[in-house]
From Swiss-Prot:
Keyword field contains Transport: no
Keywords recorded for this protein, A-Z: Chaperone, Cytoplasm, Ribosome biogenesis, rRNA processing
Family of this protein: Belongs to the RimM family.
Gene from which this protein is expressed: rimM
GO MF term (any one): ribosome binding
Top-level division of the source organism's lineage: Bacteria
SUPFAM superfamilies for this protein: PRC-barrel domain, Translation proteins
Predominant localisation class: cytoplasm
Designated name of the protein: Ribosome maturation factor RimM
Amino acid sequence: MAAADESSWPADVVEVAKVIDAWGVKGWFRVHPYAADAQAVFTSRRWYLQGPDNRPRPKDAPALPRLLHVTEVKEHGDGIVACAPEVADRSAAEALKGARIFVSRASFPTVGDGEYYWIDLIGLSVVNRDGESLGTVTDLIDTGPHSVLRLGYPSVDDKGAPVEGERLIPFVAAYIDSVQLDQKRIVADWGLDY
C-alpha cells in the first residue's frame, strides 16, 4: 500500500491566517492571524496553503507550496513572523504574499470547560428552553466584553417572499443555558419574539 501524500489536506482544516509579506532576507514571512488569540497559528507546525482569492499569480511566480513544515513562529512588534524550510529566501517568502493559511482543527490547543472555539459553534442549531428553533449559528461578533451569536433562520419579507432572518444573542451565561457540541445544539434562554 502506498504512503499517503504528505501534502494531502486533512478533512478538518480551518483557515486561520494569511501571509502578509516577506520579513528579512532569510525566508521569514509576516503572518496576519484572523483571531485575536492566535494559539492555533503558534501551535501547529503543518500549515496548508492556498493562493489568495480572486487574485491571479504572476506567470513567473514560483509554485506555491501546498504544505509548510513550520519550524519557528514568534511575535514581532504587533504581528507574527514565521519560517519554514520550504521558504529558503526572501524571493520565496515574497511569493507567498496573500496566501491563505489553513491548519488541522485537531492541532488547536485544548480549551477549558465553558470555553469554545468559534469554528466549533458555527453551524450549531440554537433552541430555546421550550424547544423552539431560534436558528443556526452563522457567525459570531466580538463586541469586546463578550461575543454575540449571529443566527440565521427562515423567514418571509413584507411581500411574503422567503428570506433569511437574522437574530443576535449575547453569548453569555445569562442567556446561554448549555452548549452541546456532541448534539450540535445550543440551548438559550431566548424568546422567538426577541
